[in-house]
């Protein structure tokens, strides 16, 4: 989606956003991982900022939370 490299600080902010979005939506980790088609461990790594989702998963996340990919992964101000 974007060519710029994600720094550790960006990854931490993205992880925080993902966790806050899930909590605001009232969804469990199990529900989100099932909706995205990823394992619980992958979701946990996304939320801790240890791993950035592939573009395909970013799109699924954006659809799940009704946000744009840019809002969630590039502005860090979606929540």
Q: At which residue positions do the language-model features occur?
A:
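DNA major-groove recognition helix of helix-turn-helix/homeodomain DNA-binding modules
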Residues: 37, 56-71
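Residues in the recognition helix of alpha-helical DNA-binding motifs
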Residues: 35, 46, 75
